[in-house]
């Protein structure tokens, strides 16, 4: 059963580098609690509480290992583990985009996290924007994604966006 808190911590804390991709529908963030030496158990719990209290219906983790997935369950948040695979990128992207599209079409508010909010996760989200037809032009999709990220994308991220339409 989900733990319910009272008082000033009842709403949790916003996950680090939380960024809306599609306002009130799809967001990205750093792994709740941080990663590596910066990982903190209490911070993880507070960030998962924030995700729950802000109505996210599903967390999708793209990190390689299934770390902390049980914490979502303990706090009453649905989670899916979809480890990013660069080895067969097109197959992974096609499957990921279809699943994400179905979640969003069903009205589920989704947050996707990697270890950090870097070009990998930003490129994957920019690719989704293009794949879903939310932006009609490759160059425009790159520009929109760079605005969301607040910086220029690396070649990997740009390539994901450029190849997204052929994955439909």
Give the residues covered by each predicted segment.
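Cys-dependent protein tyrosine phosphatase-like superfamily
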Residues: 1-111, 123-168
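Short glycine/threonine-rich catalytic loop with a Thr-x-Gly-x-Asp
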Residues: 115-122
């Amino acid at each position: 059963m989900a733990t319910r808190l009272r008082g000033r911590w009842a709403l949790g804390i916003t996950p680090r580098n939380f960024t809306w991709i599609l306002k009130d529908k799809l967001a990205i963030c750093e792994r709740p609690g941080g990663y590596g030496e910066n990982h903190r158990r209490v911070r993880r719990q507070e960030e998962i509480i924030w995700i729950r209290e802000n109505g996210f219906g599903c967390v999708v983790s793209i990190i390689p290992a299934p770390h902390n997935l049980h914490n979502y369950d303990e706090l009453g948040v649905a989670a899916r583990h979809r480890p990013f695979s660069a080895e067969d990128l097109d197959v992974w992207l096609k499957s990921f985009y279809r699943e994400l599209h179905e979640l969003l079409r069903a009205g589920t508010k989704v947050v996707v996290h990697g270890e950090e909010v870097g070009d990998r996760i930003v490129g994957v989200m920019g690719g989704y924007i293009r794949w879903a037809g939310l932006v009609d032009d490759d160059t425009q999709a790159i520009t929109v994604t760079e605005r969301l990220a607040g910086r220029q994308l690396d070649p990997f991220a740009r390539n994901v966006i450029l190849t997204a339409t052929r994955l439909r």
